Regions:
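Catalytic active-site module of serine/aspartate enzymes centered on a nucleophile-bearing elbow/loop
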Residues: 256-286
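Alpha/beta-hydrolase fold catalytic core
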Residues: 1-47, 70-71, 280-286
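Conserved HGGG/HGGXW glycine-rich cap/lid loop of the alpha/beta-hydrolase fold
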Residues: 27-86
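Active-site loop/oxyanion-hole signature of alpha/beta-hydrolase fold enzymes
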Residues: 75-121
């Protein structure tokens, strides 16, 4: 599974690079960047992709394979992922939501990118951290597509009890297999089931446990009225892992946000979703 977290995936029509950006003392996050080989496409402003909790690149390969030939793409992996380089003992507070937006801002600063010129695409935790960062003035944007954002991270009672207990490392493999089984049961879409299984099996479980303990306490602010980034919230009714009513509540709270419904969560990971992405960006004058 190490190959999931290293190397710059080479995609047709673009030059690829991988690098790490120090976002806090002893913590660096992995960044992938593609620049189209076509000079006209390469001159466009970048789209920045922030994937979800524990998400691996392979889940996004179908979309990015097409997208990287059209414009520069920057793909930022958040610090809970196995790819991040953390050279000290990790703590629960390292993975609190408040850090993630500043991490993304640090990456843009390193690359010399003004967040106000960015077209964002994000998913799940990636979408949640951007909403919080927009509200707090940490990041701006020209446009933002938010796939299945989480206003909170609601765990079942048994999981909340388990997360409060010390979990010995020798239990980790069994716990991971159990988690994969549970996700398989809860997920209606086959493509989504495959992606989650692959992502879960590729994780550093210690980091994911600490991240879960941080996320279980998190609630998106009720007041999102300070957001000035034009936002489209994307969702699929077949996505049983993200509460549609909570997603709709986010749409209502973000000024002038629009809802974009897609056929499935898997569709949002495929090249076909570029139709919806580019339609929204065109509608706001991009």
């Amino acid at each position: 599974m190490e190959e999931m977290w290293s190397g710059a995936p080479h995609l047709s029509g673009a030059n690829a690079e991988e690098f790490f950006v120090e976002v806090a003392p002893s913590i660096s996050v992995r960044v992938l960047r593609w620049v189209p080989t076509d000079s006209s496409a390469a001159s466009l402003d970048p789209a920045v992709v922030v994937p979800g909790w524990g998400s691996v690149f392979e889940g996004w390969r179908p979309l990015l394979t097409e997208w990287v030939s059209r414009r520069p793409i920057v793909y930022i992996e958040t610090r809970e992922k196995k790819s991040s380089r953390i050279t000290r003992k990790v703590r629960r507070e390292d993975f609190e939501m408040r850090h993630h937006g500043h991490d993304v801002a640090a990456v843009l600063d390193k690359l010399g990118i003004d967040s106000n010129e960015v077209d964002w695409f994000s998913s799940s935790l990636g979408a949640t951290l951007l909403i919080e960062a927009y509200q707090g003035g940490v990041l701006g944007g020209r446009s933002s597509i938010l796939l299945a954002p989480n206003p909170d991270f609601e765990f079942p009672l048994w999981a909340r009890i388990l997360l409060k207990m010390p979990i010995p490392r020798f239990v980790h493999p069994s716990l991971m297999r159990f988690t994969v089984w549970l996700v398989d049961r809860r997920t209606k879409e086959e493509g989504q089931r495959i992606r989650y299984r692959r992502a879960l099996l590729a994780q550093d479980l210690q980091r994911m446990l600490l991240s879960a303990r941080a996320n279980i306490r998190y609630r998106l602010p009720d007041d999102l009225s300070a957001i000035r980034v034009p936002c489209a919230v994307m969702t699929a009714s077949s996505d049983t892992l993200h509460d549609i009513d909570k997603v709709l509540g986010i749409v209502e709270r973000i000024p002038d946000a629009v809802l974009v419904e897609v056929p499935s969560n898997q569709y949002a990971h495929d090249a076909g979703v570029l139709v919806e992405i580019e339609e929204f960006q065109s509608s706001i004058g991009n």
